[in-house]
Curated annotation (Swiss-Prot):
Binding site for chlorophyll a ChlzD2: 118
Protein's name in the database: Photosystem II D2 protein
Keywords: Acetylation, Chlorophyll, Chloroplast, Chromophore, Electron transport, Iron, Magnesium, Membrane, Metal-binding, Oxidoreductase, Phosphoprotein, Photosynthesis, Photosystem II, Plastid, Thylakoid, Transmembrane, Transmembrane helix, Transport
Gene designation: psbD
Pfam families registered for this protein in UniProt: Photo_RC (PF00124)
Main location: plastid
A GO term for molecular function: iron ion binding
One cellular component (GO) term of this entry: photosystem II
Class of enzymatic activity (EC top level): oxidoreductase
Organism from which the protein derives: Coffea arabica
């Protein structure tokens, strides 16, 4: 039996190899295969947002002014969600709603679905970009894993939550004041601040901020002095290969402060990764629960006692009354097509207000 040994030769003009060589070439701005998703989607998402906040009204969907052209500023302009009557339509420009009419498409809220979907794929493309670059330079993929947390929050809030409700209308509009209103909506209709997943998210974000502040200050405090410059930046050579701070000194300091301290840098930095990422993941999971209208903590015994005893009140019962007020105002304003009329006896009342 004869075995022929030889080098397998591919066609030098293979289209995939040509594209791979060009996309992954070392240049000032890396493109990569992920860039085929990232750059177009980011361009269209940002372009749609700037177009909407500059020119497009929300009169036909929310009865609001939402563009610079109508007198809004950076904090009050927004790309608003489609009307509730349009449910979960993708609102394609060539779809049955707009029928290819760009002006009508903007009036119906088509820019919101355009920005939301391109924004989601743009964020995913950015995560893939980090993964692709990490593979290219033989790094571990923890940057991409960390970036999955804000992606999870974006997808859960802007896509999964409204999919669980009656339409895109109940997603946040893309604007600063619009996001604030959405937060108030979440509180009034879902009692979000008393949701354990929100609590884990807050603990993760604020805990991460605390860890960053402590870590940065500790590193600055324990820097090795290897120059006589006036400050940190002048006293050190930015290309030095040696260790720049003393982990041993930092460990001794925090051992005395707290009684415990991180013993090595790997565990320390993994913890700084774990806290915010887990917090954001948990928060995203909580929003998925809200899409299904799962409730937060209910302390019914306190509500019953507060209803029976005008002298009994807790911060919880006060907040419940505030939530009722938010619902009474927002439901009538946000859903005028429902013709919601609240009689006096169902409006918030009691010794809390």
């Amino acid at each position: 039996m004869t075995i022929a040994l030889g080098k397998f030769t591919k066609d030098e003009n293979d289209l995939f190899d040509i594209m791979d060589d060009w996309l992954r070439r070392d240049r000032f701005v890396f493109v990569g295969w992920s860039g085929l998703l990232l750059f177009p989607c980011a361009y269209f998402a940002l372009g749609g947002w700037f177009t909407g906040t500059t020119f497009v009204t929300s009169w036909y969907t929310h009865g609001l002014a939402s563009s610079y052209l109508e007198g809004c500023n950076f904090l009050t302009a927004a790309v608003s969600t489609p009307a509730n009557s349009l449910a979960h339509s993708l609102l394609l420009l060539w779809g049955p709603e707009a029928q290819g009419d760009f002006t009508r498409w903007c009036q119906l809220g088509g820019l919101w679905t355009f920005v939301a979907l391109h924004g989601a794929f743009g964020l995913i493309g950015f995560m893939l970009r980090q993964f692709e670059l990490a593979r290219s330079v033989q790094l571990r993929p923890y940057n991409a894993i960390a970036f999955s947390a804000p992606i999870a929050v974006f997808v859960s809030v802007f896509l999964i939550y409204p999919l669980g409700q009656s339409g895109w209308f109940f997603a946040p509009s893309f604007g600063v004041a619009a996001i604030f209103r959405f937060i108030l909506f979440f509180q009034g209709f879902h009692n979000w601040t008393l949701n354990p997943f929100h609590m884990m998210g807050v603990a993760g974000v604020l805990g991460a901020a605390l860890l960053c502040a402590i870590h940065g200050a500790t590193v600055e405090n324990t820097l090795f002095e290897d120059g006589d410059g006036a400050n940190t930046f002048r006293a050190f050579n930015p290309t030095q290969a040696e260790e720049t701070y003393s982990m041993v000194t930092a460990n001794r300091f925090w051992s005395q402060i707290f009684g415990v301290a991180f013993s090595n840098k790997r565990w320390l930095h993994f913890f700084m990764l774990f806290v915010p990422v887990t917090g954001l993941w948990m928060s995203a999971l909580g929003v998925v629960g809200l899409a299904l209208n799962l409730r937060a903590y209910d302390f019914v015994s306190q509500e019953i006692r507060a209803a029976e005893d005008p002298e009994f009140e807790t911060f919880y019962t006060k907040n419940i009354l505030l939530n009722e007020g938010i619902r009474a105002w927002m439901a009538a304003q946000d859903q005028p097509h429902e013709n919601l009329i609240f009689p006096e006896e169902v409006l918030p009342r009691g010794n809390a207000l």
